[in-house]
Amino acid sequence: MERMVEIERFDEEASYEVTLRPSSWDEYIGQEKIKKNLKVFIEASKRREEALDHILFFGPPGLGKTTLANIIASEMHTNIKTTAAPMIEKAGDLAALLTNIEEGDILFIDEIHRMSPAIEEILYPAMEDFRLDIIIGSGPAAQTVKIDLPRFTLIGATTRAGMLSNPLRERFGMHFRMQFYTPEELAKIVSQASHKLEKPSKAEAAHEIARRSRGTPRIALRLLKRVRDFSEVANENEVTLERARYALDELGVNDLGFDEQDIRLLELLVSAKNKPMGLSTIGAALSEDEGTIEDVLEPYLIANGYIERTARGRIATPKCYEHFKLGGITQGLFDDQ
């Protein structure tokens, strides 16, 4: 069963995310520092009548990287072509994208950390000199064909900035780290979306959904849709606090946005009694691959001070111990302390 607090997008979510996606700065909630800087850079580019410098967005999934790219295109009054690095398998794939863009257009590449080194090599001159170098043939008869490109803006998005090669990272003129959202920001997002879904949420219900959404709009919208289902079946015209609490409890999402997998991970670290635990050990104990633990389970727990990464492994923080003592979860873990 898929986790309700999964930060990656479910297959069926792509269409409704587009429906609920903000299309202007006025609608876009959160990431205020990034918005402020982007507004300046966009205005400067428009006054100079130049394409924006290349932009890199990085941070956990579901925080609005794709949405920002689309708003930038809208503000620049230009076209945007969207793809993902795994879709660009060979030089011809990249060439097809680059030769079909116009002056000032935006090319958005998601998961750019998954781009192969061979494709990166072709991308470098395109980003720096707006030139495409294509090798035709092989061996001694091989020839390099140079194709001039219109000036464009590449927007890259990644959840794993550390996996980007230095040469690729250095070719982006702007780097923006996406931050987790505050409960207040998420409550506004929930309220905004609930009106678009024609099922208004009471303010306290929006806050209840927001505080269980792990600082992530994608999760907040997913929970809202499921809470809306409970409200619909109960023949209610709006989402109430009582219905939101009931629905979220039924979905297995607790007051802090933790689900069963989070609790299992935290219990495991607490049981180690301050001894660091390696990623491979955690993976074996939870029957999860290391990538899932590192990219999906850990980010929110680390950002909120429940887990600490050390050179020797992961440990539970005092905040984590305190949560378990106060929450009444797995009291047996503390019996011999």
Curated annotation (Swiss-Prot):
<dbReference type="InterPro" id="IPR036390">
    <property type="entry name" value="WH_DNA-bd_sf"/>
</dbReference>
<feature type="binding site">
    <location>
        <position position="66"/>
    </location>
    <ligand>
        <name>Mg(2+)</name>
    </ligand>
</feature>
<protein>
    <recommendedName>
        <fullName>Holliday junction branch migration complex subunit RuvB</fullName>
        <ecNumber>3.6.4.-</ecNumber>
    </recommendedName>
</protein>
<keyword id="KW-0963">Cytoplasm</keyword>
<dbReference type="InterPro" id="IPR041445">
    <property type="entry name" value="AAA_lid_4"/>
</dbReference>
<feature type="binding site">
    <location>
        <position position="21"/>
    </location>
    <ligand>
        <name>ATP</name>
    </ligand>
</feature>
<keyword id="KW-0378">Hydrolase</keyword>
<dbReference type="GO" id="GO:0006310">
    <property type="term" value="P:DNA recombination"/>
</dbReference>
<feature type="binding site">
    <location>
        <position position="309"/>
    </location>
    <ligand>
        <name>DNA</name>
    </ligand>
</feature>
<dbReference type="GO" id="GO:0005524">
    <property type="term" value="F:ATP binding"/>
</dbReference>
<keyword id="KW-0227">DNA damage</keyword>
<keyword id="KW-0067">ATP-binding</keyword>
<dbReference type="InterPro" id="IPR004605">
    <property type="entry name" value="DNA_helicase_Holl-junc_RuvB"/>
</dbReference>
<feature type="region of interest" description="Small ATPAse domain (RuvB-S)">
    <location>
        <begin position="182"/>
        <end position="252"/>
    </location>
</feature>
<dbReference type="Pfam" id="PF05491">
    <property type="entry name" value="RuvB_C"/>
</dbReference>
<feature type="binding site">
    <location>
        <position position="65"/>
    </location>
    <ligand>
        <name>ATP</name>
    </ligand>
</feature>
<dbReference type="GO" id="GO:0000400">
    <property type="term" value="F:four-way junction DNA binding"/>
</dbReference>
<keyword id="KW-0233">DNA recombination</keyword>
<dbReference type="InterPro" id="IPR036388">
    <property type="entry name" value="WH-like_DNA-bd_sf"/>
</dbReference>
<keyword id="KW-0547">Nucleotide-binding</keyword>
<dbReference type="GO" id="GO:0009378">
    <property type="term" value="F:four-way junction helicase activity"/>
</dbReference>
<feature type="region of interest" description="Head domain (RuvB-H)">
    <location>
        <begin position="255"/>
        <end position="337"/>
    </location>
</feature>
<feature type="binding site">
    <location>
        <begin position="128"/>
        <end position="130"/>
    </location>
    <ligand>
        <name>ATP</name>
    </ligand>
</feature>
<feature type="binding site">
    <location>
        <position position="67"/>
    </location>
    <ligand>
        <name>ATP</name>
    </ligand>
</feature>
<feature type="binding site">
    <location>
        <position position="66"/>
    </location>
    <ligand>
        <name>ATP</name>
    </ligand>
</feature>
<keyword id="KW-0234">DNA repair</keyword>
<dbReference type="GO" id="GO:0048476">
    <property type="term" value="C:Holliday junction resolvase complex"/>
</dbReference>
<feature type="binding site">
    <location>
        <position position="218"/>
    </location>
    <ligand>
        <name>ATP</name>
    </ligand>
</feature>
<dbReference type="InterPro" id="IPR008824">
    <property type="entry name" value="RuvB-like_N"/>
</dbReference>
<dbReference type="Pfam" id="PF05496">
    <property type="entry name" value="RuvB_N"/>
</dbReference>
<dbReference type="GO" id="GO:0005737">
    <property type="term" value="C:cytoplasm"/>
</dbReference>
<comment type="similarity">
    <text>Belongs to the RuvB family.</text>
</comment>
<dbReference type="GO" id="GO:0016887">
    <property type="term" value="F:ATP hydrolysis activity"/>
</dbReference>
<feature type="binding site">
    <location>
        <position position="314"/>
    </location>
    <ligand>
        <name>DNA</name>
    </ligand>
</feature>
<feature type="region of interest" description="Large ATPase domain (RuvB-L)">
    <location>
        <begin position="1"/>
        <end position="181"/>
    </location>
</feature>
<dbReference type="InterPro" id="IPR008823">
    <property type="entry name" value="RuvB_C"/>
</dbReference>
<comment type="function">
    <text>The RuvA-RuvB-RuvC complex processes Holliday junction (HJ) DNA during genetic recombination and DNA repair, while the RuvA-RuvB complex plays an important role in the rescue of blocked DNA replication forks via replication fork reversal (RFR). RuvA specifically binds to HJ cruciform DNA, conferring on it an open structure. The RuvB hexamer acts as an ATP-dependent pump, pulling dsDNA into and through the RuvAB complex. RuvB forms 2 homohexamers on either side of HJ DNA bound by 1 or 2 RuvA tetramers; 4 subunits per hexamer contact DNA at a time.</text>
</comment>
<feature type="binding site">
    <location>
        <position position="62"/>
    </location>
    <ligand>
        <name>ATP</name>
    </ligand>
</feature>
<dbReference type="InterPro" id="IPR003593">
    <property type="entry name" value="AAA+_ATPase"/>
</dbReference>
<comment type="subunit">
    <text>Homohexamer. Forms an RuvA(8)-RuvB(12)-Holliday junction (HJ) complex. HJ DNA is sandwiched between 2 RuvA tetramers; dsDNA enters through RuvA and exits via RuvB. An RuvB hexamer assembles on each DNA strand where it exits the tetramer. Each RuvB hexamer is contacted by two RuvA subunits (via domain III) on 2 adjacent RuvB subunits; this complex drives branch migration. In the full resolvosome a probable DNA-RuvA(4)-RuvB(12)-RuvC(2) complex forms which resolves the HJ.</text>
</comment>
<feature type="binding site">
    <location>
        <position position="181"/>
    </location>
    <ligand>
        <name>ATP</name>
    </ligand>
</feature>
<dbReference type="InterPro" id="IPR027417">
    <property type="entry name" value="P-loop_NTPase"/>
</dbReference>
